[in-house]
């Protein structure tokens, strides 16, 4: 494992997630957020800024068979389970291309799925083929270890408070990532900060440890740090870790200026 960046309880590790997770202490993580490969890179096309573009994100997003995809998901979820605290939870984001494998893998590896969150995007990319409905949602599975004595943390009162005094439902509506959040560089699947803010507030307390095994541009870390959580992020692409590092530096420097 190569520590790419470490500062103020924020760590970015460069390497293969399967190998790096092995270095993390057992039952030390309060919450995991993962946005694993969607396996969309099949030489198809999408829309970006009104232009037709390839959906190929790189070799990391390609796979040859369902078995390979499912084995991949089972392996990283199995390793993630070891580092999760007994009362910890895991959130996994995906689309129809991978989420069914993820859900099955969670149950096969000893997790209980708590919620099936639907993130409804208010400004999705248009459907260029006109052969099916526009893809405007992503699914986020929330799960805990399937131990009947486990009592996962959920900040019910806060979720109700930020939802105008009503119980928070499992359909969350909002826009794609703002341009202002992409200033540090490009990443094909960068999540909006408001999404991670809700997830982290719902399932962790201040001072808790958050892990993102596919950290990408670092949104999970940026929000975790801003909310007073400790953070570990892993990625095998140095160019993405550089984006995450630059974003984390801004949050850390802003905190120092306000003290």
Model-derived regions, located:
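Core catalytic lobe of class I
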Residues: 1-242
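Short, conserved SAM-binding/catalytic segment
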Residues: 2-7, 245-259
